Structures are given as C-alpha cells and as structure tokens.
C-alpha cells in the first residue's frame, strides 16, 4: 500500500516537472508539420543523453527538425556536412602554429557544440566517422597533448540517406551501436503534405525563440532518472534483448537462421533508458510495457545483425523485432 502511495506522489511530481515538454513540442509543431515520431525521438535522445541516427530520403525535415530543437534551447549548434574529402581535423579541430606568438594554438572544430548535426554521416571515410564517434563516446577530444571536455549537454544527431550507395561509407556495426536510437523517417500523410505546400508557397517562415537554457536540460535529465521502472519491466526488457540472441529459447526457432548477432547489454540499457524517457514525455512517473514496445524498434533495429539468408529473403531487422515483441510475454 505504501508503495502505491509513493508511486502516486511520484506520478504527480513528474507530471508537474515535465510540463516543459509540452512547450518544446508546441515549438516544434510551429515549424515541423506532422513527423510526431521524429519529434518524440529527438526529445528522447535529448533527455536520455543519447545520440540519435536519423535515416530517410532527402526532404523529410530531418535537418529542419534538429535545427528547430536547437533553436528552442539557448545552446550552441553546429552543422557538419560530411563529404568524401573531409578530414578528422575538420570535425574535432587541430593545433595551428601562430607565428605571432611563436607557439601552437588550439583551433577547436565544430564538434565543440551542444547540438551537433552530422549531415549525411555515411558520406565521409571511416577515419572521419571514427573521430566523431570517439568524441561521442568519450565526451572529450584530444588535440596535441591537451584533452578538452565537450560542452554539456552534448548531443549528436546524425542523418543518412538509405537510397544512395555510390560514394558512401556504411557505418560499421560497432560504431552504429553508439547511437542510442536509429529512427526511420517516413513520408508525411496526405493532409500534412497539403499543409507543407501551403506554408512554403505562401512564404510562411516560423521563427522560434529559445524557451529553455542548456542547464534546464541537465536538470530535466535528473528528473527523468526518478521515473520508476518495476522489476517486472526490467525482466521484460532483458527478455526482449535475450530473444535477439537466443530466439529458440523463446519459441522463435524460425529466427535462429536469420539473426547473425543479437543486441549487447548496451541494447538492454538503452531500451530501459528510452522507455523511461518516453514515460516522462507522456508525463507519467512510471514505465509500462507499452513504453518499452513504443521505443523497441528504434533501439534495436541497428543492433540486430542479419544473416545472408535474411537479406536474401528480404527480412528486415524491424520484422524480427516485431516477431519478438509479439512472442515475448508481456508482464
């Protein structure tokens, strides 16, 4: 009984403290038509301290959404256009010799920002991708003999085009795993596209002003950590990830020859973090199974390796995750 009272009090507190989420979403809706899933995914990454990889054809508002979110928060934003001739120094910076001072001085790269948009990340060679992904993991950059901490909050939002293969360098599985979410962006609905046309041909450009400071996001992350996850939900999360490794143990023998490798413990951690933040966005103080299911595809689709047999049969990671969610017992 005492626990239910605690949960009720926590729920009321989270509902009060998460009110800024509505303001952020309203600000995003002023500029972005539709794309609710994209907006929610960006907020999950922001409040979970996790990086986001967006995949979709050009023109689906990926860059605009990221730029709008950065504008709503009074924080430093930078955009890196990844190209085949890009160098690691173009991303993280370098040491430049100053003839005036007769010494090397630090020239910090665009990665030193709160929001970093890595546009078309799969167009740059592996060594450039590695430079960014190492900064994502370590939250610091070494230039010369000095190590510089990246600003807080630090969020990388990367985009890639799934169609064009020529002149691209696919991200290795180990590096893709550093992204908390991989979000597939779909086309807008019919009515949404009519509204997009109307806004653009009328020259309507909505300008958004900052409604939060960078420190507010750091405080919000502390509040998110208070969202309650029951042991049954934790077990459910682990069961889902284990089913990607040992499908036969969950009566999914048909998946055994389709999965080359399953999710690592990082998958379980990120699934729990994302579900908790999703509950917070929905202004709830506790996680329910539907929260886990809502974020499972975005957390797992880039962490489930497919065999040649799966690729030959046109079976996607999303289909495998869907089968697992349908089979694993819900608490």
Which sequence ranges carry the predicted segments?
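Pre-Walker A (pre-P-loop) alpha-helix and adjacent loop at the N terminus of AAA/AAA+ ATPase modules
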Residues: 13-60
């Amino acid at each position: 009984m005492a626990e239910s009272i605690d949960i009720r009090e926590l729920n009321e507190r989270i509902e009060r403290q998460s009110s800024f989420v509505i303001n952020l979403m309203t600000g995003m809706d002023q500029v972005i038509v539709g794309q609710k899933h994209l907006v929610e995914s960006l907020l999950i990454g922001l409040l979970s301290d996790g990086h986001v990889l967006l995949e979709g054809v050009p023109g689906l508002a990926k860059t605009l959404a990221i730029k709008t979110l950065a504008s709503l928060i009074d924080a430093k934003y930078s955009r890196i256009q990844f190209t085949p001739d890009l160098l690691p120094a173009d991303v993280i910076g370098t040491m430049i010799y100053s003839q005036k001072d007769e010494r090397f001085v630090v020239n910090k790269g665009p990665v030193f920002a709160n929001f970093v948009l890595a546009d078309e990340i799969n167009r740059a060679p592996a060594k450039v991708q590695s430079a960014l992904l190492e900064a994502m993991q370590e939250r610091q950059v070494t230039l010369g003999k000095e190590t510089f901490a990246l600003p807080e909050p630090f969020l990388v939002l990367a985009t890639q085009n799934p169609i064009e293969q020529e002149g691209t360098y696919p991200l290795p599985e180990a590096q893709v795993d550093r992204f908390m979410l991989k979000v597939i962006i779909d086309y807008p609905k019919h009515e949404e596209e009519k509204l997009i046309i109307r806004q653009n041909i009328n020259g309507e450009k909505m300008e958004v002003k900052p409604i939060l400071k960078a420190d507010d996001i750091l405080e919000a992350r502390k509040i998110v950590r208070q969202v309650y996850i029951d042991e049954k939900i934790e077990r459910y999360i682990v069961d889902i990830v284990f089913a990607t490794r040992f499908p036969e143990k969950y009566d999914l023998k048909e998946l055994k020859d389709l999965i080359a490798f399953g999710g690592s413990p990082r998958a379980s951690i990120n699934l729990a973090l994302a579900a908790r933040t999703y509950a917070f966005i929905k202004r709830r103080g506790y996680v329910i199974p539907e929260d886990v299911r809502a974020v499972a595809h975005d957390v797992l689709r880039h962490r489930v390796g497919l065999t040649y047999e799966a690729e030959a049969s046109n079976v996607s990671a999303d289909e495998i995750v869907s089968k697992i969610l349908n089979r694993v017992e819900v608490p």
